[in-house]
Structures are given as C-alpha cells and as structure tokens.
Amino acid sequence: MRKFSLIVAALLAGCAAPTGRTLPVDADDAPETVIAKAVRVVPTPQQRHALENGFAAFVHFGPNTFTGVEWGSGVENPAVFDLKEADTDQWCRIFRDVGMKRVILTAKHHDGFVLWPSRYTDHGAAASPYRGDVVKELAASCRKYGLEFGFYLSPADLYQMEAPDGLYGNGSAATPRTIPREVPGRPFADTRTFSFELDDYNEYFMNQLFELLTEYGPVSEVWFDGAHPRRKGGQQYDYLAWKELIHALAPDAVVFGKEDLRWCGNEAGRTREAEWNVIPYASDPATMSMFDDLTDEDLGSRERLLTQEKPFWLHYQPAETDVSIRDGWFWRNDGEQAVRSADDVFDIWERSVGGNSILLLNVPPGRDGCISPRDSAVLAEAGRRIRETYGNDLLVGARCRKTAEGVEMTLPLAIRFNRLELREDLAKGERVESFALDVWVDGWQEVARGTNVGNRRILRFPEQNVLRLRVRILSARAEPRLASVAAYLAE
C-alpha cells in the first residue's frame, strides 16, 4: 500500500497538479495519468456545501394536489387550486426536526401553473381563489427555521403548449431580448438587466427565473426536471443562457439536472453500491446544454474511466437521490395512498446520505395546506433514529495509530457498534476505491467491506463488541486522505 501511494504521489507531482471540477483527458494520456487526473477533480464550494448538507425536502404542491393526478393537462381551470391556507411554518418545523437542511418547492410543474403572482402569465395561483403567494410564504418560513430555499421550475409547460397564444414551440425566431421584460405597473426592485438572443418561450422562462431569483431569495438550488409529458414544435431550451442568468443572480446556488447535480437514475430510493462523483463526459460539460439521464450502475469506477473513449472530460457531479415518502409525488388522499414506514426512510437515508449522494425526500402537503399527520409521524420517528444513532460517535476518546494499510483504533472501554462511517477530505479529491473493517477478537477478523468513500460512506454490519478495530484501505487512486472515522450503534 505504501509503495502504491508513493507511486501515485509522484505521478500527481509530475502533472503540475491543477485542480478543478472539470479536467480534460487527452488522447495520449496513459492509464495512470487518467487516474491521477481523476483525483484532482474536486467540487466547487457550492457542490461541497450541498453534499455536506446531505438531506433536503422536496415539496410537490399545486393543482395536482386538488385533482388527484401526477401530471396535469395544462388546461385546468386555475380555480381547482382551492387552497384556503398554506401552513409553511408547519412544513419547515417538520423538515428542520428531521434534520433536513434545504427545501425545494415545485414553483411550476409540467402543467405550467405557477404558485407565485408572475408578471408573465395569468395561469397560476393569482387566478385561483387563493390570495396568497405560496413561494413567498415558504421562503419566509425557510428563513425563520434556518433552512435553505430552492425551487423546481419545469422546462416543460403544457399550458404554454395548449393555450391559443402559447409560447412553447410556437416557431418564433431567436432575436435580441432583454431580461427581465418590463411590465407596466410591476417594476423590479433589482434593476439589473441582461441581453440574450432568445425565442419566445426561452424569454418567458428566463423572465420567470428572474422573478424567482430576485424576489424570493436567497436561492440555494434551482431544479430542472428532465421529464416531459410531451413536446411541441421542436422547442429547444437555451440552458447556457439560463445558466448565465442563474450564476449572475444566485452565485451560491447549485443547478440540478445540469452540470452541478445529477439525477440518481431512479425514483424508488435505490442507490448504487459505488456512487462516484467524478464521472466521464464525451463533451465539456461547461458547453453542454442538455444532460442525459445517467442510469448505469457503474459511472465512475477505475474500469469505467479507463475504457472511456478518449479524449473526454472528467467532471465532478454528485447525485441527488430523489424519492417520495408517498406512493406518488403529489398528495392524493389520506386513506388509500401508501406512505413509507420510518424503517424505510431510515434505510434510504443511510444508503443515500451514507452512500456519497444527497437525499431529496418528497413530502407533499395536502389540500388543507398542511403535511399529513401520517407523514409527520414517519418523519418524526425517522428523525429520532438518525439523531440517536448518528449523534453519538463511539470512537471519541479512542487512541488512533496510522498504519501502512490505514488506521487502527484502540478504545479505553469496549464498544458495541454496527455502523462505521468514513469521510474523505473533498478538497483532496476522491481517492479510496475500497476498504475493509477489521475487529480484534483473538486476532484480527474482517467484519465488512466497503467501496468508495467520497463525502460520506456508512458501512452496515452485524453488531460487534470490541476494544480494537482498524480500517484497511484495499485500493486507492492516491494516498488516502480520510477526514474522519466514526462508529455508531443503530438499535
């Protein structure tokens, strides 16, 4: 192991070691150079912050809540959104207490109905019986309860497809446009303007981005869904323009569905055995407008990187594991609609947050504007288990000794534990490829093995009762840089 580390360290030194979230791999790069470059691909501060937060709430809310469907038609009467009150304080208390750090609201789903009083469409909550502004209310509650706020804005828009004067796929040409477009009687407090070559729908979309980013911030995440009920007129999205606007107005925000964060590949809470954040792209992600859904089991292993056709780009792109607490994304009823158990939520949390990804758990409010007692009870129990398990590191006070293979720990008193947590120093790149946990019981005995580490790796195994344990690094891309090792007991 020591010899391997010295070899890789020498390789890194010879590469002049520039780092960044994207590095090119040249056609003549040797295998060892490819792996050395992969180590130097590191997250942006915004990506690192999102990863370290780990746990976020998804809130699907809108006309579908009242019609009982998952995807609306775009021709719904706004009056179906018959909301009397939205108790966004209740939402945020529940989210905070379970340990979530961020809330993402569906400000506009595929139906095109907007939850805020937009200057640019009449198809929204402002045309419904509800006189409030759900986006504003939730953003205020997030600030009150110490949560970050983000929004989901669907590129798909069935209303703009179906309306007689709809802008989606209307065949308009890209011409010089100013964002935001001035609307008489509705000035912006933020007086900045931006010029782009846009068609009608991209202008409409960016005007709404401007509203959300300037009037409801600070915004920590912008969520772009890749799903489309259907398309029309060959409509293309000018994501590079969207990105420029987001970076200008919300420089601390990450963008989901593009180069900052990617989809985990399913909506069922399944996780990969090895979730790598450094993955290969055939094109430079900085110039890409569309990002395909990545569903392969292996996205970033050594074998995957070394079989990628050159040249290519190595890019840092963490996964978000999005899953709903209910059977469906929107609330339908409190009788027949299934709700996940606390066991299930705790299991998904351990596998996602503890598997080098971010957990985005959807908790949809009902027609009364509140989160159902069924959902809140599950979250309260799952939150209790997370706090009681992961709030007590059993290795505090241990004597640690670095070895040629990893690290050995000796406790003053025997501990009972069945979880091991490793974290890497993200500023030093993804290095560990596999590791083993050994315990001392009349000699060293291997208990469990894990794959890559990244931000956080939680290893689960049968309960142990020991005074000594060690972590052996079985394979690594460079000298391991572990930030922490912890042990816990899940009852």
Please tell me what each predicted stretch does:
Residues 2-7:
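Sec-dependent signal peptide recognition
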Residues 19-461, 472-483, 488-489:
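Mature catalytic domains of secreted/periplasmic carbohydrate-active enzymes
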Residues 464-466:
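Extracellular Ig-like/FN3 beta-sandwich strand-entry sites
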